[in-house]
């Protein structure tokens, strides 16, 4: 479509309509030819929208060999090059031109490949041209948009111009496969998955050299998996590449690879992991397979890895939960526990009638699920959909039921059905994790097993005779339910006095179901499992008004438990619970006393003492739950919180939690200061050290001592012999800079204690002060090492001043230019060239010639001056060659070189005085060395004085020559004016010559001759 830019604007509308109609016709022909072969393999150029549509790398060919003629084969290739075969044209297509001008379109888009219009704003150009909600955008200005991603379509629409042409199709919105249920579209053709096309790069990420059983990664995916399974695998890998979370990858991929043949895909996935991630992945999957083998279900995985063995923690758990059925009702054992012991053979139904224990699948959409998603979307601020890569915080897997008739760990059908009255998903539930229907599978507990609490129960005011004889049996239809599973038991009960993070309450029907099942597999009829009743609150706002749902309002904040032998721990929901007010808790507790008394009376005659640890005596429920010992610890400061999604319990977590206690995380992330003073060990306490130098000076002196790498005695010898071989000028400057001042010298002289009590820099300075005339020796050493360099710099500076003064005074071409400037200025100022002439001007006006612009504003006075000199006085244009030293003299700082010369003379005088003051000895050679040095450098200093005198005399003369006061004007200011004038004149001259003489002159036309 690059030819569109060559079409005149008045004909572009017809061009767009013709192109759109042509594309639609070709699309229809492609459909009619492609119907006998509805499964066409897309070319790589169509799978990746980043490549141009005209790519010749591959073309679409029939997936299966057929009897079509070669002509139809070629037609298929041609049509599929421009129109992808995944799309089916319909009669609802229409071409619309949007006259938007500089406005926005006025609609919002959703989805990709193709995108569709989610909403149309009233009064917008989109509404004016007839676009409606649900229209799919197929073509934009003749360009195919059906395989493009959402971001690319948006960018193409933004650059589509003022009157873009759209080909849209009406009809219901087709959500991508990721937003729909895989069970609803099992027969979708492979060529109709644009979402899978966008993930094709994942299947091609491994090189073709990596093969298993003779096939590459993409070939094995296509050979072994269905369309939905391939999408799930690719989407899981794409998410893993972003977050590198192996646990999430296993949760997403493991349920798909559920056969020995499919599990070959793991060998390709391992190639994308690091060595540590491979070991972690193998360990996790071994736990899955180990649990399934315990349930008499062979995994058939052909890969090699080591299975995890039960440890001491598992033995403790087996002693605590003695029920053989508890493993079957706990979906977390496969993640957090080693393989359980096999079940007795009489407990299991025949193998062909049994379903697999644990699978990973998503629940079907229901009315309660939609309510839950709406509530969650309001909290999060954006729409939350059920997609395949949806990662629930805890419940990424669920449990399938056995075929047994009257299992005690089964729930009745009405408890798990989506249409249940007593246990429907409420609107205030905000848990991200959910299971089939409206039931929630709780995660493993987060705390070790505490001693059991007293037997207590809190229910609604109406008492119920809950006995196994009076309660009905569960309907047998539940055992054949393919999705709904009984809620699992946590391996360990919660603390009695600790506020739970996941508190739920069972309904009355749940309590009936718990006692209605006869015990079939219990070896000890007297033992009873634990039933936990929690408060089903999700929002932090506590509502005191009664709930309108048939579910009874349980508001007790205390964990109540009942002991039963062969039943699992039933929990209906899992939500976060705030603390209730004391008055409300007390009121609800009073209402629940009748049922509590009746229920306890029923159980008191049947419940024997549980195994150790023994139960504490029963007591009344407190008004508020007691805080945990960790929360009541006064030394535990408030720390920052980390926001994450909770996963299932890990058997190694408690070992890590014990180790974390010794990491001192409160010191790093604490938000409160501990009022108690911190006690430092003895070796870190500051000793009694005497400090005389200031803190900053002592710190810098310590750094200097480390750099010198000289002992105090060695430095003292250097100062006595005045040797310059081991000291750099920079070190001598720092020694002078950090030397003690007069006040500190007095403190050192009065110090009569042990020198070892002084700090290290103070000890160093104390030894240096024992050298007579310490600072004078340092200054003399510095002068001895730097005087030659200083004299050379000053000599060069004075020579520049001297030469520049002579050049300005003797330049004839500069004088001629200044006369021309004066004449032009007189003409402009007076109007007539011969009346009231000005005889001179200040030289600083030379820097302002470019500020006076011409009438048209295109040139300046300096440009006119350069142009006039080019035409009338071309010999004056090279005046800058007469002033070569002037730019160098402009950089000389007169004050600096004058101060340096004065410092040289003062230092020489101080050294001579010190030579007279310090007597010459065999050890102290200061006087002999420095006297000889002064005699040697005297001629150079005397020559420098003479040059300085001559340079300044010449400068005074040239300043007076140009009408400046030499006593006020400095050298850098004076020479800087001429240096700036030379630079600006050269620039204006080059601009003028460039305008008059262009680089590529054109030959005059013969017609102009």
Swiss-Prot record:
Task: Write down the CDD domains for this protein, in alphabetical order.
Answer: HN_L-delphilin-R2_like, PDZ2_L-delphilin-like
Disordered: where is this region?
A: 28-82, 170-193, 322-369, 414-635, 990-1009
Tell me the Pfam families matching this sequence.
Answer: FH2, PDZ
Arranged from A to Z, the UniProt key words for this protein are: Cell membrane, Membrane, Postsynaptic cell membrane, Synapse
Q: What is the protein name stated in its UniProt record?
A: Delphilin
Which residues belong to any copy of the PDZ domain?
95-172
Q: Where in the cell is it found?
A: Postsynaptic cell membrane
Basic and acidic residues composition-biased segments: 44-53
Q: Which residues form the FH2 domain?
A: 629-1009
Q: Which PANTHER family match?
A: DELPHILIN-RELATED, FORMIN HOMOLOGY 2 FAMILY MEMBER
UniProt key word Cell membrane: yes
Predominant place of localization:
membrane
Say which species the protein is native to.
Danio rerio
Q: What is the lineage of its organism?
A: Eukaryota, Metazoa, Chordata, Craniata, Vertebrata
Feature: compositional bias, Pro residues: 441-455, 462-477, 484-493, 607-628
- Any one annotated GO CC term: postsynaptic membrane
Role summary: Postsynaptic scaffolding protein.
Residue ranges annotated as compositionally biased, kind Polar residues, are 322-332, 557-602
Where composition is biased (Low complexity), the residues are 334-352, 427-439, 521-535
Which SMART domains does this chain map to? FH2 (SM00498), PDZ (SM00228)
Q: Can the keyword Membrane be found in this entry's annotation?
A: yes
